[in-house]
Structures are given as C-alpha cells and as structure tokens.
Amino acid sequence: MTNQPRLVARLLAVASAAALMHALPATAAEPAAPKWDVNAPPAATVRQVPISVEAGSWMDLDVSRDGSTIAFTLLGDIYTMPISGGTATRIAEGLAWEVQPRFSPDGSRIAFTSDRGGGDNIWVMNRDGTNKLQVTKEDFRLLNQPTWSPDGRFIAAKKHFTPGRSL
C-alpha cells in the first residue's frame, strides 16, 4: 500500500505532461521554397528588348493534322499562324526557352519542351496558348522532342542518357 501514492503521483505526472503537450501550439513548419519559374526569377530585373528578324535558325515547325495551321518556334517563343500565310500569334513567350511544338491529333492542344520549371521538361497547352501544364518533372535526365500517340492519349519524349552534355 505504500507504493500506491507513488504510483498515483507518477500517473498524474504523465497525464499532466500529456495534457500540456497537447495544449502547446505546434511549432510552425519551415515554409516551402517557392517553385522555380524561369519566367519570374527571384530578385531579378527583367526587361524586354524588341528584336526584328527576317529569318530564323534553330526553328521547330509542326503542321496541324487538318493542314490549316503551323506552330513554330523563334528565339525560344512559340507562335502559330495560318498555313496560307498571315500574321503569326505568339502563344508562349517569356524568359523560358519553349521549343518543339507538336499539335495533338485533334489539333486542340500543343505539346512542347520548356525549361520554365528549371530544366527541360514536356508541357502541354491549349492551341491558343492558355492552360500551360507541366506533364513531366525531370531534373537530371531531361526530356525533349514530344510526340503524340495517334489517339492523343499519350506523349512520348526523348530522354537524355549521356553522362554529360555535348554540342
């Protein structure tokens, strides 16, 4: 019987400690680092400089399946225009290098390669440039050259497997 008061005291101490732990506010977790966006680098001043060109190099080109529209890249931006000629509309622009546009089989979307997330990955956007969505998230073996499956359900892309970069 002499141990019973000691046992009760221990139980009260444990219960008090447990209650105190639940009553204390939780320590705030470290805030997540902001997601890297090439188009909005932190602490950088960005300014646009107009460039007028009459020809291009290192360009990528794709024709919509219905043959009415071309998508092409120039200086890291993606444009569309009627295949019959006319004015080009820039649908992907900014500091990110956005290249290799490929129309989906139904022509409603365009897959492309972009480094806007920090490395070359495959993205998809609507034909008019809206709703850009990153579909791969590689940070080591980077991806490029997207190709749609005939039914438009899948995208295949080239993945780098070289031990280093080359020209």
List the predicted regions and their residue ranges.
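Bacterial N-terminal signal peptides
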Residues: 11-23
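A structural motif specific to WD40 beta-propellers
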Residues: 89, 132-133
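Blade-terminus and WD-like Trp-Asp/Gly-His loop motifs, strongest in beta-propeller folds
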Residues: 62-68, 101-109, 146-154
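Sec/Tat signal peptide C-region and signal peptidase I cleavage site
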Residues: 24-28
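Bacterial N-terminal signal peptides that target proteins for export
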Residues: 2-13
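Blade/loop signatures of beta-propeller domains
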Residues: 29-50, 68-69
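A flexible loop/linker signature enriched in serine peptidases of the S9 family
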Residues: 30, 34, 54-55, 73-79, ...
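Beta-strand-rich domains and repeat architectures in extracellular enzymes and scaffolds
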Residues: 46-81
